[in-house]
């Protein structure tokens, strides 16, 4: 089964990818890493603006019409949510489209790691008449189409494109951006029943709570693998500052477990907690991972249900398979409970 928005969104992603790579080729690292603004959802860097300029223009040109507008949720747009085309009647919208134009900005702008374009599509949930209750807001689990496209480093000529329609599996291709040729790509999550000698980690990207996150990580690993052995590495970690990139590593079989627990600490500490957490747009392509067999949950082991906005904080865990989940999830929840982090 296909979806009417698969090809328009893939085309949108290709244009964003081309424009961002071209900007990276032209610009100095310092200019791309300048702070453009501080939005509700995240800090916006100069490189982000390159993608945002394309986003509304392409959606207006290829997807949205006055008779069938689109509700666009994205970083960088006014209020994090706009109607495309502007001035259209939102009650007539068929789709809510949530986009992260560049996920992994920090690694990409310094040319350390590829970034990703992330898009999720859900049926629009219209608001009811004034004075009545609002219809339920669309959440991550309502997404029925997800598209994820790699933004390569300047020195990299191959890049991957992934997409999935809910209940109908996932597809992927590897594209040569120099020739335009593409070949089918088989993504297969790890089937290993252990984390030993594999990649498994808890995200701790930024200062503030890294010691506590590392302590949880070490507790889980020691419970599973025993105390560290002198001169031997029991397992490895990769702090990829991109939620889409982390999902890709699970899909590709490179990683066996990833968890981002930052919102739990913010909830516990209130205003004194870390200001930067994962948001719904960072995880709007988790459908692709689930269609490939990756198990993606919240801190309680439930499906992700954050609203499609740019401000909600999202705690998530990804397990390559059911064996890994059975191995880690109880220990993770015990560690969180001991610290009073599970509500």
Give short role names for the model-derived ranges.
Residues 104-105, 289:
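Conserved S/T- and glycine-rich ATP-binding loop of Class I adenylate-forming
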Residues 6-9, 13-16, 20-24, 28, ...:
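An extended, acidic
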């Amino acid at each position: 089964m296909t979806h009417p928005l698969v090809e328009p969104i893939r085309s949108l992603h290709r244009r964003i990818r081309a424009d961002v790579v071209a900007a990276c080729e032209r610009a100095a690292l310092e200019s791309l890493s300048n702070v453009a603004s501080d939005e509700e959802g995240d800090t916006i860097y100069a490189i982000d603006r390159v993608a945002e300029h394309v986003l509304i223009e392409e959606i207006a040109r290829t997807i949205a019409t006055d008779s069938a507008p689109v509700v666009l949720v994205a970083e960088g747009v006014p209020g994090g949510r706009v109607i495309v085309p502007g001035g259209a009647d939102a009650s007539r919208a068929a789709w809510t489209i949530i986009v992260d134009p560049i996920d992994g900005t920090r690694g990409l702008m310094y040319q350390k790691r590829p970034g990703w374009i992330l898009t999720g599509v859900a049926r629009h949930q219209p608001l009811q008449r004034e004075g009545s209750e609002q219809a339920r807001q669309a959440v991550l689990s309502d997404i029925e189409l997800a598209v994820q496209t790699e933004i390569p480093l300047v020195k990299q000529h191959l890049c991957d494109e992934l997409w999935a329609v809910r209940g109908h599996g996932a597809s992927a291709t590897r594209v040569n951006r120099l020739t335009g040729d593409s070949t089918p790509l088989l993504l297969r999550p790890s089937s290993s029943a252990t984390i030993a000698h594999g990649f498994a980690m808890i995200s701790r990207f930024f200062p503030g709570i890294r010691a506590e996150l590392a302590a949880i990580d070490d507790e889980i690993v020691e419970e599973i693998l025993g105390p560290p052995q002198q001169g031997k590495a029991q397992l490895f970690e990769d702090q990829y500052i991109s939620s889409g990139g982390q999902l890709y590593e699970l899909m590709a079989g490179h990683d066996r477990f990833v968890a981002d627990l930052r919102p739990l600490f913010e909830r516990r500490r209130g205003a004194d907690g870390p200001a930067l957490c994962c948001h719904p747009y960072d995880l709007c392509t988790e459908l692709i991972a689930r269609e490939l067999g990756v198990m993606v949950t919240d801190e309680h082991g439930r499906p992700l249900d954050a609203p499609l906005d740019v401000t909600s904080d999202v705690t998530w865990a990804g397990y390559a398979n059911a064996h890994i989940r059975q191995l880690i999830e109880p220990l993770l929840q015990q560690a969180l409970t001991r610290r009073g982090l599970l509500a």
